[in-house]
């Protein structure tokens, strides 16, 4: 009896466990309250209209991006970074870029939809402290890219790029391209090589090593990191041409054992390596064959004909014309060349492309233009011609016009005064300049 009472007491003291819920259960229709609120306040209409407008705008701007522009254009007589509608080029597809390369650069080469920023590229310029390289660096910096200059300063000058030293997007490395270098980049402009007879004849073995081993190293870098590679070759690959004007399909007439062969054959070999990497390793490559170029920042005593004539006229020395003065050359202003290089890099054609001004001058005519510009009383002095000096040189730029939409804009009489102004400042403003003038060449 007692045990029954005890058990009943325990039953009374321990009530049945009730179901426990941390939060009260809400009916299912509570989940649609936000939708009902949006409908009541008509906010859904505004959201849908906004999405429709954004989609329409993006579609319109995407359709207009079927062009491959150079984001900035140059007013060659006023400066860099000028925006121009003429810089937008129709993209004629020759070979589609690799998926790896396009994934790296994104839409950096085309028009950017409204509200989206252009992707900043990491670009290396070998020989970027030199004459042409420094002008190219100016354009790339104006475009907003991160630029790395690689130069051994054999012919380059720090003064050419000093104005970028405080820019966080600029980096300069003292390095010789005959030695390998590891960098993470999207594009490689390979300009490193002595380009004047005085410099490449000074050390011909070093010149051909720069052309061959240096190009090999830069192509290897492009292969490893998936960068696009642009080789600056030269009109010297045509040698003393038997075809005039020269087209890209002409194979040339080069002396392989002459005093200029270290440069001529070196560039021909560099083109071979570039195409072998393109065909064998699927490297994105571009090849430019550059004709005679002039402008500010040229070396004063580098032995090239324009710089020699200008320096001699400023120093009141006779203008030295070699041979009978009937040899012909074509001269392009440096801003025209830089524009062509950038269009080639951003385009979809491998090349090679002739980049030069088809306006042809004899050496005697050039000397007279320099006389008119600097000193009408300057004398002209004739001397024996140099070895292996080509008799004629004129580019056929039909291919560049059709596929790149490029042609030079600056005439010789327009660009020469800008070069004279720069030379005048350096010749008379720097007392350390050597007053002697090296022997001229029609390079």
Swiss-Prot record:
Record membrane topology: Single-pass type II membrane protein
Cofactor: NAD(+)
Parts of the chain that traverse the membrane: 44-64
Signal peptide interval: none
An annotated Gene Ontology molecular function: NAD+ binding
Catalytic machinery residues: 263
EC number: 4.1.1.35
UniProt KW keywords: Acetylation, Decarboxylase, Golgi apparatus, Lyase, Membrane, NAD, Signal-anchor, Transmembrane, Transmembrane helix
Binding residues for NAD(+): 151-176, 263-267, 304
Gene3D superfamilies linked: NAD(P)-binding Rossmann-like Domain
Matching CDD domains: UGD_SDR_e
Modified residues (N-acetylalanine): 2
InterPro entries found in the cross-reference section: NAD(P)-bd_dom (IPR016040), NAD(P)-bd_dom_sf (IPR036291), UXS-like (IPR044516)
Catalyzed reaction equations: UDP-alpha-D-glucuronate + H(+) = UDP-alpha-D-xylose + CO2
Pfam short name (any one): GDP_Man_Dehyd
Subcellular location: Golgi apparatus, Golgi stack membrane
Pathway the protein takes part in: Nucleotide-sugar biosynthesis; UDP-alpha-D-xylose biosynthesis; UDP-alpha-D-xylose from UDP-alpha-D-glucuronate: step 1/1
Any one cellular-component term (Gene Ontology): Golgi cisterna membrane
Binding-site residues, substrate: 260, 292, 305-309, 322-329, 389-393
Stretches of the chain found on the membrane's Lumenal side: 65-443
Domain of life, source organism: Eukaryota
Example GO BP: D-xylose metabolic process
PANTHER family on file: UDP-GLUCURONIC ACID DECARBOXYLASE 1, UDP-GLUCURONIC ACID DECARBOXYLASE-RELATED
Family to which the UniProt record says this protein belongs: Belongs to the NAD(P)-dependent epimerase/dehydratase family. UDP-glucuronic acid decarboxylase subfamily.
Protein purpose: Catalyzes the NAD-dependent decarboxylation of UDP-glucuronic acid to UDP-xylose. Necessary for the biosynthesis of the core tetrasaccharide in glycosaminoglycan biosynthesis.
Protein name: UDP-glucuronic acid decarboxylase 4
Protein's organism: Arabidopsis thaliana
Biological classification of the source: Eukaryota, Viridiplantae, Streptophyta, Embryophyta, Tracheophyta
Gene name of the encoded protein: UXS4
């Amino acid at each position: 009896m007692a045990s029954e009472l005890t058990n009943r007491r325990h039953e009374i003291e321990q009530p049945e466990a009730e179901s426990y819920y941390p939060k009260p259960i809400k009916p299912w229709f509570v989940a649609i309250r936000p939708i009902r609120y949006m409908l009541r306040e008509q906010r859904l209409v505004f959201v849908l209209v906004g999405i429709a407008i954004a989609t329409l705008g993006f579609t319109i701007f995407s359709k207009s991006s079927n062009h491959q522009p150079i984001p900035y254009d140059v007013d060659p007589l006023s400066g860099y970074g000028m925006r121009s509608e003429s810089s937008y080029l129709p993209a004629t597809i020759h070979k589609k870029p690799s998926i790896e390369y396009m994934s790296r650069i994104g839409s950096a080469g085309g028009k950017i939809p409204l509200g989206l920023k252009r992707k900043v590229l990491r670009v290396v310029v070998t020989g970027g402290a030199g004459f042409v390289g420094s002008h190219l660096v100016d354009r790339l910096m104006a475009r907003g890219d991160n630029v790395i200059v690689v130069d051994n300063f054999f012919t380059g000058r720090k003064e050419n790029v000093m104005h970028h030293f405080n820019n966080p997007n600029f980096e300069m490395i003292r390095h010789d391209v005959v030695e390998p270098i590891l960098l993470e980049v999207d594009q490689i402009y390979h300009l490193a090589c002595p380009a004047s007879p005085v410099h490449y004849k000074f050390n011909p073995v070093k010149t051909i090593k720069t052309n061959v081993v240096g190009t090999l190293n830069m192509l290897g870098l492009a292969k490893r990191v998936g960068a696009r590679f642009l080789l600056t070759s030269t009109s010297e690959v045509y040698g003393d041409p038997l075809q005039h004007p020269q087209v890209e399909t002409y194979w040339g007439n080069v002396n392989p054992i002459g005093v200029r062969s270290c440069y001529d054959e070196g560039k021909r070999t560099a083109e071979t390596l570039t195409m072998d990497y393109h065909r064998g390793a699927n490297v994105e490559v571009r090849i430019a064959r550059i004709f005679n170029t002039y402008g500010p920042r040229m070396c004063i005593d580098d032995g090239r004909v324009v710089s020699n004539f200008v320096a001699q006229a400023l120093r009141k020395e006779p203008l030295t014309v070699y041979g009978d003065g009937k040899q012909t050359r074509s001269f392009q202003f440096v801003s025209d060349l830089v524009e062509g290089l950038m269009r080639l890099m951003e385009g979809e054609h491998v090349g090679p492309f002739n980049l030069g001004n088809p306006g042809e001058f004899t050496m005697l005519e050039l000397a007279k233009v320099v006389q008119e510009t600097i000193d009408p009383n300057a004398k002209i002095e004739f001397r024996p011609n140099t070895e292996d000096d080509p008799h004629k040189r004129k580019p056929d730029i039909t291919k560049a016009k059709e596929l790149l939409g490029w042609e030079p804009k600056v005439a010789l009489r327009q660009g020469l005064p800008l070069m004279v102004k720069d030379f005048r400042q350096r010749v008379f403003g720097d007392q350390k300049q050597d007053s002697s003038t090296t022997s001229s060449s029609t390079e």
